[in-house]
Amino acid sequence: MASTPPLSASPNSSKPTSPRASNRGLGLTSRQGSRSSRPSNDNGSRGVATTPIPDEDHSADLPLTMSASIVLTGLPKDAHQALADVEAIDSGKVTVRFQPLPSAPILRNRVFKISASQKFETVVKFLRKKLDCKDTDSVFCYVNSVFAPGLDEGVGGLWRCFKTDDQLIVAYSMTPAFG
């Protein structure tokens, strides 16, 4: 913001001689109207030399989002690397441990392996098959006994975020167990 020069009065003018006097009619307090009387921040006003903060050198390529440009012919190298990392993670198998809640039938073998690229729907179908459920029976599944994931959630993503001892713990019940 540019500072305004202090008001000065000529011998023949009827203008006020100070900023405070000029602000009395405007309803401004002395603090609001006395900005011009404050010392400026240039180098010669106080005798203290101020050095500008140097800009950082950004020599690395900044990552771009796909929405950054309408005409984006290819993905930036960071996006290629991120996609390759995600594909590598979801190409393996993850361990799923089924944990029965009260009043649920117990499986003989509770630990199974499933492809990380599968949806959680596959886990529920597999569990229904192992429990010999009818089409009308309900099975409620909860990850870590905390939440019920959507059927379209990826098993690899759930395992990465909520694994316990490198296993995805899926608690199951025939009746709703958690609100």
Curated annotation (Swiss-Prot):
It is found in: Preautophagosomal structure membrane. It is a peripheral membrane protein. The keyword Membrane applies. Residues 1-60 are annotated as: Disordered. There is a cross-link at residue 179 (Glycyl lysine isopeptide (Gly-Lys) (interchain with K-172 in ATG5)). It holds the Pfam family APG12. Keywords: Autophagy, Isopeptide bond, Membrane, Protein transport, Transport, Ubl conjugation pathway. Coiled coil: none annotated. Signal peptide: none annotated. CDD domains: Ubl_ATG12. One of its GO terms (molecular function) is Atg8-family ligase activity. One of its GO terms (biological process) is autophagosome maturation. Residues 1-21, 29-44 have a biased composition (Polar residues). InterPro entries: Atg12 (IPR007242), Ubiquitin-like_domsf (IPR029071). The keyword Protein transport applies. One of its GO terms (cellular component) is autophagosome membrane. Ubiquitin-like protein involved in cytoplasm to vacuole transport (Cvt), autophagy vesicles formation, mitophagy, and nucleophagy. Conjugation with ATG5 through a ubiquitin-like conjugating system involving also ATG7 as an E1-like activating enzyme and ATG10 as an E2-like conjugating enzyme, is essential for its function. The ATG12-ATG5 conjugate functions as an E3-like enzyme which is required for lipidation of ATG8 and ATG8 association to the vesicle membranes. Belongs to the ATG12 family. Forms a conjugate with ATG5. This is Ubiquitin-like protein ATG12. It comes from Ajellomyces capsulatus (strain NAm1 / WU24).
